[in-house]
Regions:
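Domain-level detector for long C-terminal conserved domains
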Residues: 2-59, 63-571
Length: 571
């Protein structure tokens, strides 16, 4: 906290062990890499060959949720055309604990399941993603997905992946668990089991989510963090919102929603519903030591213990992932000095747009104040081309959900491969392996894992070939030539405990780490005008004033949010 802060400094939450969501907008990683390479080519006055149809590989280090995977996968056809190659996009996911990795699997499983209508699937996804407590129907969905994951993933671990009922499951086709050790596989299966309900008449497992009260667990966390400010926590929340959230440019987050999350853990309200069930995907293990005695140096000593409970973030809201940025800038329109939409509505729009593009193969477009009729038809009906070709527009509009997402959706998921990396020593167990040297087009590092930006991480990014060297990919020696990898680092702009000075220092430190890893910031281009729908392309308003221009520094790429910093591989 800065020295000009009017309140006493509050330290980081010492009981914040697991990170279940990021603090930055979702990225289309393929688009970011393309923009970075284009900026680099412009700066060097050198044309770069386009390899948009080449396989795309990404390493995600501590991104905490699958927002980048969902967005990149949904918009893939914008870069490669209508046909997606099988397993043409590979995502390697590293998290610091297995419960965080298991949550990636759960959230993607909810999106890829075709037994729910799209609109309901969006609600369930956001509810599981954002809320500490769930509706009863959503809790049943989590148990159903957990049973499915336990059955399919267990069969994969047992070498039965070729069985017809397992091989045809999207979970088996999309996820790769071959990089996990036996102990990590056991931990993953234990996560799935802990999400399931206890059988009637059974004593159950001590790790079952039904033995925990999320409200009581959060209340203990809040009492410990706020201490003597607990009775005035609503005032602290108000200060954090006005001096951190709104001041950082995230005013689209409504204060009512932010306060509801901070006080109750419910960030995504669903109409007038109640949330009586604990969200089991937010429960995890924390390890520590008891304070039983002090040694001669007056240091606390005791037994090593583990405790299962709610150890997630209670300060930073999950709205930044899908709710603070969108392609449709009309969602951020201001009328009468009030925002027309809020972060909850923007989150619904972004997830719905991604799911629609997965199903229809084209972007979600809005006409006037609402959604195009053709878009709504494809959203409410099955979009299989062979079926849709025989239906009129009115028949499509009146069609009911048939429980199948069609060929386009199936092809979208066949193009993806998500490999889970175990929460071990990343550098020794993964980055040091020869097969991953210069293997990734992009590496995304979360703000909580900035210390993992090391020279070893830089070595797994694709490097430019020089002289007579060639890089052969699938037998093509020209397609991959001169393709540099991109390092994308999440900033601390939206951390409620970091002021502008601390965020700037964080950017400077990550830039130093990136340079040591063999990467340089993408050269800054000309400043771009701020988005303002009431201003014409000339940049001059009706009153004669000019549209303000957004400052851009090194690493901030045009068309990409200013929370992330992008660095290009230099050698």
């Amino acid at each position: 906290v800065g020295t000009n802060d009017p309140r006493p400094a509050m330290s980081l939450d010492p009981h914040h062990v697991h990170n279940f969501w990021g603090v930055s907008p979702a990225l289309d990683l393929r688009d970011v890499v393309r923009r970075c390479r284009a900026d680099q080519a412009t700066a060097e006055e050198e044309a770069r060959p386009d390899a948009s149809d080449a396989p795309f590989s990404t390493l995600l280090v501590g991104t905490n949720d699958p927002r980048h995977i969902v967005t990149t996968l949904a918009r893939a056809r914008r870069h490669v055309g209508p046909a997606l190659g099988e397993r043409s996009m590979t995502f390697h996911v590293y998290e610091s604990s297995m419960v965080e990795a298991a949550r990636h699997v759960l959230l993607l499983c909810v999106l890829m399941s075709d037994d729910l209508p799209p609109s309901e699937r969006v609600e369930r996804f956001l509810e599981i993603f954002m809320n500490a407590t769930l509706r009863e129907s959503t809790a049943e969905l989590v148990e159903t997905c957990a049973a499915r994951l336990e059955r399919v993933v267990g069969a994969m671990f047992a070498g039965e992946a070729d069985a017809p009922d397992i091989a045809n499951d999207r979970v088996c086709r999309v996820f790769d668990f071959s990089l996990l050790k036996f102990k990590e596989k056991d931990e993953l299966m234990e996560c799935f089991r802990s999400w399931r309900a206890e059988p009637r008449g059974s004593r159950g497992s001590s790790s079952s989510a039904h033995r925990f009260d999320a409200d009581a667990l959060r209340d203990k966390r809040l009492r410990k963090y706020y201490d003597d400010r607990y009775d005035h926590r609503a005032n602290v929340v108000d200060w954090d919102y006005n001096m951190r959230v709104d001041a950082a440019g995230a005013g689209v987050i409504h204060f009512k929603h932010f306060a509801q999350f901070r006080l109750t853990g419910v960030a995504y309200p669903v109409r007038e519903a109640t949330f009586p069930k604990t969200n089991p995907s937010l429960l995890g293990l924390a390890f520590g030591k008891t304070k039983e005695f002090k040694d001669r140096d007056l240091a606390d000593r005791g037994r090593s213990v583990e405790s299962r409970g709610f150890w997630g973030d209670v300060l930073n809201s999950p709205y930044h992932c899908f709710g603070t940025d969108a392609e449709d800038k009309k969602l951020f329109r201001v009328a009468n000095r009030q925002r027309v939409h809020n972060a909850v509505e923007v989150s619904e729009h972004n997830v719905a747009a991604c799911l629609f593009e997965m199903r229809a193969g084209k972007p979600w477009r809005r006409a006037g104040g609402g959604v195009e009729t053709e878009t709504m038809n494809a959203w409410s009906a099955d979009v299989d081309d062979e079926v849709a070709s025989g239906l009129t527009a009115s028949a499509k509009a009146n069609a009911e959900w048939c429980g199948s997402d069609g060929a386009v959706f199936e092809e979208t998921w066949r193009a993806a491969r998500v490999a889970i990396v175990g929460p071990t020593d990343l550098e020794k167990a993964f980055l040091a392996k020869p097969k991953f040297a210069r293997a990734f087009d992009a590496a995304v590092v979360g703000a909580w894992h900035a210390q993992r930006i090391t020279p070893a991480l830089g070595k797994v990014l694709k490097a430019e070939t020089r002289g007579g060297e060639t890089a052969e990919v699938d037998g093509d020696e020209t397609r991959e030539r001169n393709r540099k990898g991109v390092l994308i680092v999440e900033g601390s702009k939206y951390f409620v405990f970091a002021d502008a000075k601390a965020s700037a220092a964080f950017v400077e430190k990550t830039e130093t780490l990136a340079r040591d890893a063999g990467c340089a910031p993408v050269p800054p281009a000309e400043d771009e005008p701020e988005d303002d729908e009431d201003v014409p392309e000339s940049g001059i308003r009706a009153d004669g004033s000019r549209r303000p221009r957004r400052a851009r520094g090194p690493g901030v790429v045009k068309g990409v949010d200013d929370v992330h910093r992008c660095y290009m591989k230099t050698s």
